[in-house]
């Protein structure tokens, strides 16, 4: 009788541990990631092209100097496809990509097949790299970003330049408004 009771208790404890296993596997840091995206202005870059990281660091330094309340940070993804996925699914708002990767993402070509076509906008570019945003990035935020990156200059020159006419990605409306000289309060 004592032996059966021990087996039964062992069975119950094992069953209770196994019943909690799906909960342990379902844990994701999604809530923390959501809070991180809401609290900080994240500028995404990717590890397969370290120049994206260099430019993202410069952009964040500009934001720190001119838009300190944005609490800007660089978020590094493993590759351009991951950045494209985050931008086109509205999980990220800003990213630095090589010009060719940004064009491929905009057209859903090459490694970006199946991504939401035309879901990005350009804000600025520099030395073959483009600062892109999600097409849902608010206009007034894009205006502030454009004001910061176009007007801030240091020993390395301007942070970003206005995208050239040869870039097929449309300019974000907020950045366009800034470049046309419209004041921020005209947008709100």
What are these regions (language model features)?
Residues 7-27:
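N-terminal export signals
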Residues 37-49:
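Short, well-ordered beta-strand elements
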Residues 45, 122-141:
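A bilobed periplasmic-binding-protein/Venus flytrap-type ligand-binding module shared by bacterial periplasmic
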Residues 52-68:
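Short, polar/charged alpha-helical segment
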Residues 68-85:
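Short helix-initiation/N-cap motifs at beta->coil->alpha
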Residues 92-113:
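A ligand-binding cleft/hinge motif common to bilobed small-molecule-binding domains
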Residues 109-125:
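Short beta-strand->loop
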Residues 154-188:
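An extracytoplasmic/periplasmic, membrane-proximal ligand-sensing/linker region
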């Amino acid at each position: 009788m004592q032996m059966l009771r021990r087996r039964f208790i062992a069975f119950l404890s094992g069953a209770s541990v196994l019943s909690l296993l799906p909960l342990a596997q379902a844990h994701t840091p999604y809530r923390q990631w959501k809070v991180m995206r809401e609290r900080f202005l994240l500028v995404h870059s990717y590890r397969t092209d370290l120049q994206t990281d260099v430019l993202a660091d410069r952009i964040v330094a500009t934001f720190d100097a001119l838009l300190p309340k944005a609490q800007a940070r660089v978020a590094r993804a493993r590759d351009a496809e991951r950045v494209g996925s985050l931008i086109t699914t509205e999980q990220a708002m800003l990213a630095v990509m090589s010009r060719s990767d940004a064009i491929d993402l905009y057209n859903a070509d090459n490694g970006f097949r199946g991504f939401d076509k035309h879901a990005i906008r350009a804000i600025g570019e520099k030395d073959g790299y483009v600062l892109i945003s999600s097409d849902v990035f608010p206009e007034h935020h894009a205006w502030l970003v454009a004001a910061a990156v176009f007007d801030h200059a240091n020993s390395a020159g301007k942070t970003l330049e206005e995208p050239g006419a040869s870039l097929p990605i449309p300019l974000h409306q907020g950045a366009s408004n800034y470049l046309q000289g419209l004041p921020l309060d005209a947008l709100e």
